């Protein structure tokens, strides 16, 4: 039995909501994947704030219609597609997809859209090579902490330097 119009509208509304919350969309050809493999991919993506949706291209076309951030996705809407919508950890999610593809050897990345721009295969691989969100945050925190420490040392050095200068001056005056 086919889907009802109400059911299709509900799916389109859900897709629009997911797209609004997403930073990146990756389109995969899922032909040949088993249910178990799709479940494996979905669980890998959950830890990286990603979600994998399998839906008809026509419904995705309706969901992106009128949304300038996602209109370039239209060129990828052919064949059997799974849509990976990533909310936060883009690098981690792309790594999870590539790791999954390496293990199963059944799925191909058709393309991706990030910040309203289609990405090439090499750009997608570059994103996967980026450190995770947590690692980047730790590096930034370390850098900020280093700057704060240097400022504190410099601020403490001013009174100490002034005291040494005054002491030297007073010793010269006594001589």
Curated annotation (Swiss-Prot):
Top-level taxonomic group: Bacteria
A GO MF term: large ribosomal subunit rRNA binding
Disulfide bonds: none
Pfam families xrefs: Ribosomal_L10
GO CC, one annotated term: ribosome
Keyword flag rRNA-binding: yes
Record GO biological process: translation
Alphabetically ordered keywords of this record: Ribonucleoprotein, Ribosomal protein, RNA-binding, rRNA-binding
Family recorded in the similarity comment: Belongs to the universal ribosomal protein uL10 family.
Subunit structure: Part of the ribosomal stalk of the 50S ribosomal subunit. The N-terminus interacts with L11 and the large rRNA to form the base of the stalk. The C-terminus forms an elongated spine to which L12 dimers bind in a sequential fashion forming a multimeric L10(L12)X complex.
Functional description taken from the UniProt entry: Forms part of the ribosomal stalk, playing a central role in the interaction of the ribosome with GTP-bound translation factors.
Name recorded for this polypeptide: Large ribosomal subunit protein uL10
Species in which this protein is naturally found: Prochlorococcus marinus (strain MIT 9515)
